[in-house]
């Protein structure tokens, strides 16, 4: 089984009265995949080899919200390595950052 990754733009929905985040909405997403992603996801702390996996660092199939710097690194990596659908990854990340939204990844392998 190969690695599949979804890159999403996620917007926070805030309460009009207090401004607290009450929900989130996924605005856009794109799919990618392939073994080239393992290196980036391992450096990010998302992918941990099975032997080193604990309950605390097991992100398999879970959403990880990236900060702006990590999101930029994601785009740079996708473009440099020319991963599958790197243009879609660049588009989702660029739009998310332009709109002040979060970039979220979810992968399984």
Segments and roles (model prediction):
Residues 1-109:
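Acidic (Asp/Glu-rich) sequence patches and key acidic residues
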């Amino acid at each position: 089984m190969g690695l599949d990754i979804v890159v999403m733009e996620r917007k926070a929905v805030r309460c009009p009265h207090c401004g607290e985040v009450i929900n989130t909405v996924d605005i856009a997403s794109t799919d990618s995949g392939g073994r080239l992603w393992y290196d980036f996801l391992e450096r990010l702390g998302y992918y941990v080899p099975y032997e080193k996996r604990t309950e605390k660092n097991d992100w398999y199939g879970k959403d990880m919200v990236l900060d702006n710097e990590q999101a930029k690194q994601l785009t740079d990596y996708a473009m440099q390595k020319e991963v599958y659908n790197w243009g879609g990854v660049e588009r989702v990340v660029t739009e998310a950052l332009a709109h002040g939204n979060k970039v979220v990844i979810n992968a399984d392998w």
